[in-house]
C-alpha cells in the first residue's frame, strides 16, 4: 500500500460495523431504479462496480420509506415488503464485491411531485418549495405515521441484508424540512427550539431501535449549513443537532449542505477545495461518534482531512462515479491511473433538473458497467484515430486497452481539443487534470501520438490502418459581421493567448461560454 494515503486505508467503524477503509460511496440520486421503485440490473451493476473498486462502505441512494414520498421519477422504494427481493439482491452484490452495504431512507416532504404520486405534498408547515405547490401541514398523526414508516423501512433494510441505514435529514428532504426554521414554523413540540425541531429524529431512532435493536448501525445525514436560505440551518444549530443525535442513539453523522438552489448544494469547479471540511471539523469537536464529510473530495484531499483529524470518513461521490476503481488504484500506488471527475455537473443536470438516469461526461461506462466491460480483441488490428479531443482520446485509449495497435493524429500541438480550450476559462484550470490523465494512460498503453499533423485522406491511406476512427470535432458557428476579420468564434478567441490591442471587443451571447470568455478577455486586455 502507498504510505502517502495511509490514513485513507485505515480500518474504521460505525457502531458495530467494521469498515475496511475510510472511503465511502455516498447516496446519490442515480435514476437507475424502475419507475415503480424496484431495483434493476443497471442499479446492481453500478453499485457492484463501486464495491469491487475498493470502497469500504457503499450507501445506496435514497429510497422511499413512505408510500407517496416520491420526488423523482426513478426513485427506489422501500415502503413495502414487495420490494424486499430486489433490495436483498442489491445488498448481496455489494457485499459479495467486498464492501459494506448500507441504504439511505428519504421522503420528499414538501418537494413531492403530485404528477408522480397523485397526492398533494406534505411538510412540517404549509410553506411551498420553489416551483412546487403549497404542501399540507402534517398533523401529529401524520408525524407518527412517518416515524413508523422510517422505522419499518429500516427494519426492512436489515431484513434485506443491509448492514446499516442512513436517515436523510439533509438537502431539501422531509426530515431536513423539520430541522430548518425556514421550512418549520410549527408552534407545537415539533417546532421552535433546536430540540423541538430535532424531536422527529429522536422519535425515528427510538421507533427504529424497537425493531432492529441496539446493534444495527443507524446514522444521520444533515446540513452543516443551509446556503441562501433566510432562517436556514446555521453551524451552531448543526453542532447542536449532532450532539442531540449522539445522545438519541445514532451511530454517526454525515455532513452535507443544503439550499433551495441546488447550485449552492452541489460543489462545482468554482467551489474552493474542502468547502465543507471546516464545518465537519467544528461538528466533530462536539461529538465522540464518527463524522463523515462530502463535497468534491478526492484521495489526496481525503488523506489531508483524515490526517488533520477533521473527519472520520470521506464521502467520494462524483469521484467514484468517474472512476469506481479509485480506491484500489490509489492503494496500489497508482493515483495517476484514476480518471478524475471534471465537475461539469452533467450528472446533476440530468438527475435533478431533467429527472432522467445519470450519465458522466468523463466516464461513458457509468450505469452501463456490464454493457461496456472491456473485452480483449480477438484479433489485434492497426487503428488510426484522427482528432485529439476528448472523443479521440477516449477512442484511442479504449482500443489500445483492448489490445489494438493505435496511432492518434492531432492537428494541433497539444491534446485536449475543446476541453483544453475550456480549461483556459477563469476557475476551470482543473479540467486539465482529465487531459493529463489521458496523456498518461495513452503512453502507458503504447499509443503512438502524432501532434501538429493534419490528417489528410492520403496520409491515412499511407499509414495502412485496418480501421480509421474520425473524431475531428465540429466547426464553430461564427456570428456574421460587416468585416469578416472582426468576427471570431468563441472557441477561437479562447484559444488565442492574447487579444489585439487598440480594438473594441463585443461578446455576443450570454451563455456560460460567453461570460467566461468576457471574463478571460478582461484579464488579457
Question: Predicted regions span which residues?
Answer:
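Rossmann-like dinucleotide/flavin-binding elements
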Residues: 380-408, 450-458, 464, 472-482, ...
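A short helix-to-beta-strand connector/capping loop
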Residues: 310, 442-449, 483-486
